[in-house]
Each structure stands twice: as structure tokens, then as C-alpha cells.
């Protein structure tokens, strides 16, 4: 195994430590699992051409206009969008269908909106 050094924000480290205490694993094991998950997901996304899925977005009210505008720019892949207010934040579930590259591009643009805390893509293959 190789050894690496990692710098993360204090808040994120606190959250990681809470999880590893509950899971009873080391920081190294936690990071190893997270990296493996990310690599597998990236590999899977790169192999499938056409997809159907859902993007979960968590944000505050400042992002509403930007998200609605972005959805209209990607209306070729956005099927429907559902917005749920929850504990001072907004959870939006966006059903999507289309080409992998277009879906990934849309998801990345959602992540780039400053008031978006999370944009998580979940997909299945149409093959």
C-alpha cells in the first residue's frame, strides 16, 4: 500500500470522525472505502451510454432561480422536478433520461451553483 497525505476542512473531519466512531473503522479504512466507491461509480458512469435516473439536490432558497434556469437549458433530459422544503433547506428530486455525457454535464453544473450543498446522481442503464 501507498501512504498519502490529505488536507480537509475541520468541519468535514469532524463529520468523518463521527462516522468512523459509529462504524468502528479507522480513518484510513474510511478514506479507502470512499475512494473505492468513487472510482467504481466513475468507471460505471463512463461505460454506459444511455441512462435514466434521478438527481437529488439540497440547497437554500438563493439557488432556486439558478436551478430552474439550468433545468430549462437541459429540458431534453429533465423529465420532472419535485421540490420539498425541509428544515430550512430545499430538497429537489429531478428525474432524468438521456445520454450519459449530457446528464453528467447537467449534474456538474448543478454542483457548481454556489448555494447548492449536494447534487447526487443516481442512475440505471437503459441498454
Curated annotation (Swiss-Prot):
Pfam families: NikR_C (PF08753), RHH_1 (PF01402). Keywords: DNA-binding, Transcription, Transcription regulation. The keyword DNA-binding applies. Transmembrane segments: none annotated. Belongs to the transcriptional regulatory CopG/NikR family. This is Uncharacterized transcriptional regulator MJ0080. It comes from the Archaea. SUPFAM superfamilies: ACT-like, Ribbon-helix-helix. It comes from Methanocaldococcus jannaschii (strain ATCC 43067 / DSM 2661 / JAL-1 / JCM 10045 / NBRC 100440) (Methanococcus jannaschii). The keyword Transferase does not apply. GO terms for biological process: regulation of DNA-templated transcription. InterPro entries: Acetolactate_synth/TF_NikR_C, ACT-like_dom_sf, Arc_rbn_hlx_hlx, CopG, CopG/NikR_regulator, Ribbon_hlx_hlx, TF_NikR_Ni-bd_C. GO terms for molecular function: DNA binding. Gene3D superfamilies: ACT-like. Chain A, domain 2 (3.30.70.1150), Met repressor-like (1.10.1220.10).
